[in-house]
Amino acid sequence: MIRKATVMKVYKDKYDDYKQRHDKLWPEMAEMLKAHGVHHYSIFLLEETGQLFAYLLVEDEDSFSEVAKTEICQKWWAYMAPLMETNDDLSPVSHDLKEVFYLA
């Protein structure tokens, strides 16, 4: 498995909405992620800044790179766009993190 981590940003007045939408993650979104080899996906919030830290395991980069091309992912991005910083295609503005330590 490949460990991935990224940071994003949710607007400070949208924390509750962000959590509620993820608490009710669309079943087809969860199914698509699993079908593309995504496991143990967690998102954490730093409330002081709105920074989100996402951590997930993926089976392989090629399969994971296909996630963004799916119709359901693009619908999810549009659904979440009012709550967070996004790019022109409505994908979240995100920055991949470089792993500097791991203890198995």
UniProtKB/Swiss-Prot annotation:
Phylogenetic lineage: Bacteria, Bacillati, Bacillota, Bacilli, Bacillales
Pathway in which this enzyme or protein is active: Carbohydrate metabolism; L-rhamnose metabolism
Quaternary structure note: Homodimer.
Compartments reported by the entry: Cytoplasm
Enzyme class: isomerase
NCBIfam families for this protein: YiiL_rotase
An annotated GO cellular component: cytoplasm
General function of this protein: Involved in the anomeric conversion of L-rhamnose.
Residues involved in substrate binding: 18, 41, 76-77
Active site per database record: 22
Name of the protein this chain belongs to: L-rhamnose mutarotase
GO process annotations (BP): rhamnose catabolic process
Entry GO MF terms: L-rhamnose mutarotase activity
Highest taxon in the source lineage: Bacteria
Family stated for the protein in its record: Belongs to the rhamnose mutarotase family.
InterPro entries (alphabetical): Dimeric_a/b-barrel, L-rhamnose_mutarotase, Rham/fucose_mutarotase
UniProt keyword list: Carbohydrate metabolism, Cytoplasm, Isomerase, Rhamnose metabolism
Enzyme Commission number: 5.1.3.32
HAMAP family with a match to the protein in the record: L_rham_rotase
Reactions catalysed according to its record: alpha-L-rhamnose = beta-L-rhamnose
